[in-house]
């Protein structure tokens, strides 16, 4: 623990917790301070001016990161017949129907994203209490209930990141790896922030995107100027 504390203190050196940095400067600072023995995930956190307890202030969506997420995503697909074949051909890791339902009910959830064709939703709906809390329930709003199985599997494998606002009005996601080039991380961060901006709910009042911070898995958070992240949107 002492070693970990020393490493964290070292990572914080040179970072002014009261200062707001540009996105490019923050990315460089995080990469320069990354000393973990694994390829850390680069994370973004956004504080939004919404209260998700109200239905008209819920923020949810999906972002296709232009440079991928850097992680291997296991995809499960509920489908039958030709659509099941399409899912397998597209690279889905698990494909099934009642058999997949039984596997999940038995406690085995060996996937990161779940996709379903519309006709499978009565079956998948029985898994709401299992998949819902894990953020794995297929939803047409984020493109995971669809007849375009090939496209959905490809998006999931290629770096599509789902987001949903939490109780405190925070949206966060992993948007790459510290090993990525600086520009690739910047592009991913801007794409994610733009997706969140476009998902602004009708009930949001006042400043929608209030604060943004970035960090690595094991590193400290760095405050970022929203204007340096939002390319074409107003904070």
From Swiss-Prot:
Protein name, per record: Large ribosomal subunit protein uL1
Record-linked InterPro entries: Ribosom_uL1_bac-type (IPR005878), Ribosomal_uL1 (IPR002143), Ribosomal_uL1-like (IPR023674), Ribosomal_uL1/biogenesis (IPR028364), Ribosomal_uL1_3-a/b-sand (IPR016095), Ribosomal_uL1_CS (IPR023673)
Name of encoding gene: rplA
GO CC terms of this entry: cytosolic large ribosomal subunit
UniProt keywords, alphabetically: Repressor, Ribonucleoprotein, Ribosomal protein, RNA-binding, rRNA-binding, Translation regulation, tRNA-binding
GO biological process: regulation of translation; translation
Self-association state and partner proteins as the record states: Part of the 50S ribosomal subunit.
PROSITE patterns hit by this protein: RIBOSOMAL_L1
One matching Pfam family: Ribosomal_L1
Family per similarity comment: Belongs to the universal ribosomal protein uL1 family.
Keyword rRNA-binding attached: yes
Top-rank taxon: Bacteria
Coiled coil (UniProt feature): none
GO molecular function, one term: structural constituent of ribosome
Main function: Binds directly to 23S rRNA. The L1 stalk is quite mobile in the ribosome, and is involved in E site tRNA release.
